[in-house]
């Protein structure tokens, strides 16, 4: 079982021509749906409102095969993100979070997740920012079994991060237990403002405690860099006509984690860069299909079989 923890929200997608569309979203939410669509055993841990938006969020999780027993229902209104698309389909985000559903995840909500002793735990995005959710998920990371693979998708959101110094400190603490880290070049610039990209990648790929850690660094349509300690592999992304980039990184990370768990891989296998690269290649195919559609609409397992 994979547990994905963090926010579920509504993306209000604003197109360059002025059209607006309300779409289910949130990095962890998209990740859970992707794994479910690919056929993985996955549960979502997070707060979901009882309002109409929340009902839609819950229904889509269920439709995609995501277990709901760790979902915490609340009367708080659904958290909202406004995603403004430019002419290339790239999205920039603003968030409306005060008094809404996602941030209020409390420490009492993680007992069920710990009882599962999951094979993998995935977290990131606003789950590293919004309180008390961020403190709760940091505690969860510190308490999962040693056998649980922890994957963190940094997915930094500067516009939702009032205290960048405190945020960086929390991320560093969480990454100390992380086995797989997905970052973008924008994330690296935000986490390490005083370092160039290569130095930042080296810093995040080489934990002070030693051990094996895989870093997957994305850069939009440019090649993905797979880093395991000092080893590097550059992976070209599949060519695709982009409709929009909403959910692209989530789809990539979910595809990687699904492939890793499906293949019976463990934390120890992260030393094998060829294995990490193979899972990243699968993730890039998942992301390529996602960006060819409007909104965060990841592919199903049957679609991945075409051209495999």
What positions do the PLM features span?
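Ribokinase/PfkB-type carbohydrate-kinase core domain
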Residues: 1-3, 60-62, 68, 87-232, ...
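Positively charged, low-complexity intrinsically disordered leader regions
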Residues: 1-15
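Cofactor-binding loop segments of dinucleotide-utilizing enzymes, especially the Rossmann-like FAD-
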Residues: 7, 46-50, 155
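Active-site metal-binding loops of divalent metal-dependent hydrolases
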Residues: 8, 27, 126, 154, ...
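Substrate-binding N-lobe of the ribokinase-like
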Residues: 16-90, 98-102
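Short, conserved phosphate/pyrophosphate- and ester-handling motifs at nucleotide-, phospho-/glycolipid
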Residues: 35, 184, 249
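Conserved phosphate-binding/catalytic region of the ribokinase-like
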Residues: 194-308
